[in-house]
Curated annotation (Swiss-Prot):
Keywords attached to this entry: Ribonucleoprotein, Ribosomal protein, RNA-binding, rRNA-binding
Description of how the protein assembles with itself and partners: Part of the 30S ribosomal subunit.
UniProt KW RNA-binding keyword: yes
NCBIfam families associated with the record: PRK04211.1 (NF003254), uS12_E_A (TIGR00982)
GO-annotated cellular components: small ribosomal subunit
Protein task: With S4 and S5 plays an important role in translational accuracy. Located at the interface of the 30S and 50S subunits.
Name of the protein in its database record: Small ribosomal subunit protein uS12
Disulfide-bonded cysteines: none
Gene: rps12
InterPro entries per record: NA-bd_OB-fold, Ribosomal_uS12, Ribosomal_uS12_arc, Ribosomal_uS12_bac, Ribosomal_uS12_euk/arc
């Protein structure tokens, strides 16, 4: 068997398995998953949702070919103090969110946990304001409590 770099004998399974395991580390997705690199850089630290305080309201310009100012807020997370930008979904949502309000944010649902649509660098969206669903406030079913 000249030229073969792999063991080809009858009892070579263990050796072949070890060799495969060694080569898996060149696969970027495998390496990121095993070393939990996503969790280490994620401001939410792997959690599906997080609470935070609104620091400021910001308008973010959408990417080409669209032209709009998307209403967002800068949120400081309570668990670690990191500041992230979160999108305010819904018509007139900015009117119901003020600075120093407590909000709950979650992922915006972009590909591979990244930004969504024409919003550059925005990975999260606001779902609750002062403990009440933003969707219910916008529909007029519930009122935003004053803190």
């Amino acid at each position: 068997m000249p030229g073969s770099k792999s063991p080809r004998g009858m009892f070579a399974a263990r050796k072949l398995e070890l060799k495969r395991k060694k080569f898996r580390w060149s696969d970027l997705e495998y390496k990121r998953r095993i070393l939990q690199l996503k969790k280490k850089v994620d401001p939410l630290e792997g959690a599906p949702q997080a609470r935070g305080i609104v620091v400021e309201k910001v308008g973010i310009e959408s990417r080409q070919p669209n032209s709009a100012v998307r209403k967002c807020v800068r949120v400081q997370l309570l668990k670690n103090g990191k500041v992230v930008t979160a999108f305010l979904p819904g018509d007139g949502a900015l009117l119901f969110v003020n600075e120093h309000d407590e909000v709950v944010i979650e992922g915006i649902g972009g590909p591979e946990g990244r930004a969504y649509g024409d919003l550059p660098g925005v990975r999260w969206k606001v779902i609750k304001v002062n403990g009440v669903s933003l969707k219910e406030i916008l529909r007029g079913r519930k009122q935003k409590p004053t803190r």
